[in-house]
């Protein structure tokens, strides 16, 4: 795998393509997550802290608010995933973090603080994604929602939601950056697939 690019074989030119298995899909999404977050933070770093914190009438207010939401949301889900019966060693460092209680809070007041946490998180996500095994995906995960309601969902479906949530809010952040005059560049998943 080249830096920032993932290699996923989809079959040869002589045979019908074969589907990517679930573990490969998760690894691809973890790599895409890291690549896109780096692009977003590089783009955001061209703005001042005042521009980043400016209310843009977005769901999370500002660019900084949207990026904070992504980081807090990832933290919530990863802490839930740490309760999986497999006891993922890559997620143990999360035990020192408090569970976020408000996904709209600006927990990190500067891009530098947020960027440091984000870099730590996306490396943790990659390490964890590469530690997953196929049988891990077939469990149901018991957790509590942000409102305290008990929930029980298929683990693989929760992973799909986790990465989809990131993509959704990165799209919002990309729009806010574009409106602020910053070009994030190519954001397509295809850009990292060989």
Residue ranges of predicted features:
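Short, charged, low-complexity loops and linkers
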Residues: 19-29, 104
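Helix-adjacent hinge/juxtasegments
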Residues: 86-132
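Residue-level recognition of alpha-helical structural elements
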Residues: 22, 52, 59, 107-110, ...
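Short, Lys/Arg-enriched N-terminal segments with co-localized hydrophobic residues
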Residues: 4-19
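Short, contiguous alpha-helical
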Residues: 27-42, 46-100, 144-194
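Acidic catalytic patch
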Residues: 131-146
